[in-house]
Amino acid sequence: MAPNLRKSHPLLKMINNSLIDLPTPSNISAWWNFGSLLGICLMTQILTGLLLAMHYTADTTLAFSSVAHTCRNVQYGWLIRNLHANGASFFFICIYLHIGRGFYYGSYLYKETWNTGIILLLTLMATAFVGYVLPWGQMSFWGATVITNLFSAIPYIGQTLVEWAWGGFSVDNPTLTRFFALHFLLPFAIAGLTLIHLTFLHESGSNNPLGIVSNCDKIPFHPYFTLKDILGFTLMFLPLTSLALFSPNLLGDPENFTPANPLVTPPHIKPEWYFLFAYAILRSIPNKLGGVLALAASVLVLFLSPFLHKAKQRTMTFRPLSQLLFWILVTNLFILTWVGSQPVEHPFIIIGQLASITYFTILLILFPIIGTLENKMLNF
């Protein structure tokens, strides 16, 4: 009998073990769809980005008009650009839901998978930031100026670091050129990190909603989960294409329709919606260095999740107190996002400060306490 090529060929064997014959827990819910959705988001972004790069000019005098040219004169250029811009939003929606699922179901106990995931998040944030600068509109320019300027808060080397990043004494042509180079490069770094992320995941196997070992009840990935993933793709592409076709500028800033002008500061500088929660935490501290540290901590705190898990049960499925705390945290993140979009004035300042304190208190103090308390309740 001839050997099955799918199982014997060196390359196909790897694909087979990762996507076809992979033993998968039979009870994983739709919350486990976001990994594959992130994969399809990445592929879509790389494809649309490549097509946009063919028509883009990384020069301060031409960048804005080259984007306008793409939208007006290139065949379906408007659609490619709208899909790329809104695809970034969907990428972040998926990654936040993916992290939320990992947090709720205790997936962070697979430490290597979790840590590579956080590195992926940081790389994605860097990619989105440098990408937002490329159209060279007002918010692009001032966003780049404000965020890169934060590095000057680093003692001793800060100012040198900022000027090195800018390639001069202000955000100018060298900055735009290097940001374009980075924006082109980083998605491929994300693709490479994704393979590492998957390698670590397949080392342990997927977690499941019950958080128990599922070796006794596994089914092949194909056809069951390939079909489920295709349904997920459809359900994601539907709102993405609807947004790109009917309301492409809904999530953007009107300020970015004005070409960058270093002499005119926009009344309210703010990043894209997916960074607003971190921006609100940054603004809630009146000290520059303190704000930068809080901003970094808002994401890096995720690295501590495996060490702050005190509960005997892995998931929150049967832990109502932790569930309540989790949803308070989610609500708190929505409040931070809203505050980040508001001007720096009363009452938004105090709301932002309270929400920032609540964010860190829940993650660092309340979750371990509630976990320990629930352990005690198990003994009654």
UniProtKB/Swiss-Prot annotation:
Binds 2 heme b groups non-covalently. Heme b b566 binds at H98, H197. Heme b b562 binds at H84, H183. It comes from the Eukaryota. Its main location: mitochondrion. The keyword Mitochondrion applies. One of its GO terms (cellular component) is mitochondrial inner membrane. A ubiquinone binds at H202. It is found in: Mitochondrion inner membrane. The chain crosses the membrane at residues 34-54, 78-99, 114-134, 179-199, 227-247, 289-309, 321-341, 348-368. It holds the Pfam family Cytochrom_B_C. One of its GO terms (molecular function) is metal ion binding. Its cofactor is heme b. InterPro entries: Cyt_b/b6_C, Cyt_b/b6_C_sf, Cyt_b/b6_N, Cytb/b6-like_sf, Cytochrome_b, Cytochrome_b_C_euk/bac, Cytochrome_b_N_euk/bac, Di-haem_cyt_TM. Signal peptide: none annotated. The keyword Transmembrane helix applies. Component of the ubiquinol-cytochrome c reductase complex (complex III or cytochrome b-c1 complex) that is part of the mitochondrial respiratory chain. The b-c1 complex mediates electron transfer from ubiquinol to cytochrome c. Contributes to the generation of a proton gradient across the mitochondrial membrane that is then used for ATP synthesis. The cytochrome bc1 complex contains 11 subunits: 3 respiratory subunits (MT-CYB, CYC1 and UQCRFS1), 2 core proteins (UQCRC1 and UQCRC2) and 6 low-molecular weight proteins (UQCRH/QCR6, UQCRB/QCR7, UQCRQ/QCR8, UQCR10/QCR9, UQCR11/QCR10 and a cleavage product of UQCRFS1). This cytochrome bc1 complex then forms a dimer. This is Cytochrome b. It comes from Fulmarus glacialoides (Southern fulmar). The lineage of its organism: Eukaryota, Metazoa, Chordata, Craniata, Vertebrata. The gene is MT-CYB.
